[in-house]
Amino acid sequence: MSLFKSSAVKGVCNKGKKPVIDVDEPSPKSKRTHFSTGVYDPDLFRSYAAFQTYTSQFRDTPLLVERAVDQHSLLDTNIPIWFATKDWNFLLSNLEDAYENLVKEFYANAIVEGEQIKCWVRGKRFSVTPVYLANILQINRPILPIPPVYDELTPDEEVLREALGANLEFSSNGKSISVASLSPELRLLTMIMFSNLYPLSSTGYMNLGQALFLHDLITDIDIDVCSYIFHIVAKTIDWTASRNCIPFCRLISRILKLKGVYPSEDERPYPRPSPITIHTLHASMSHTKKNPKQESHAT
């Protein structure tokens, strides 16, 4: 349950030696040294094909790490209203530290089979499903016959304008909208969305499916966010989307920790981005005034 709805749900503490709650079998921390040498290592990849996938698609792709949202500082904005009925607190809070090699190995080794991702990371086998994501994120999924795939939807312009503002600007081809044409608080919500809910590194424009996700969020339409996270992760694994970043890194790291997969002693956490606060809103407003809008492709 979100802080905006009542009190905060505290995430699992990363400090101290607490027992793992979701381990298939006991697994101590690895003591081996791990370097990205470019040489196939059967301890790190389930097959040579997985190693080739890692080398060609993931090794040089940067991580897009989720940003914690300082919910207390935003209580005087509209953000609390938009999240009031959503129990997405874990998605907005500090999850586990992300470890670059582990995250990339997760994606390179994973295989998507329908509504299941079969995973293999450093010898551990496990599966990820929308139901599993809901369990570890403590989210009550809405009952939807078929959760919409937002990437495949093309909503009517007027539907978007009614919720997102009459001044909403569309790109010349009509396939995306300008984030700068949104109100300051909607731009802040978009920043939260692009970081934690619908990962996107290029934030100047968003496609119509992403705009509909934003529309549904502020109009309190049910969103099966676990199904959509699964969809994004699966697309990244299959590389069916044109992506220049690797999403949900801290969520993946949380899954790995729960499954008893740990970084080696020489691995260090990926730098955490700054949290999203009321100061982020003020900085965004100032930046928009100083910089003209530039159109970019939204994928």
Task: List the predicted regions and their residue ranges.
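A structural signal for long, well-ordered, hydrophobic/aromatic- and basic-residue-enriched core segments
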Residues: S2-S296
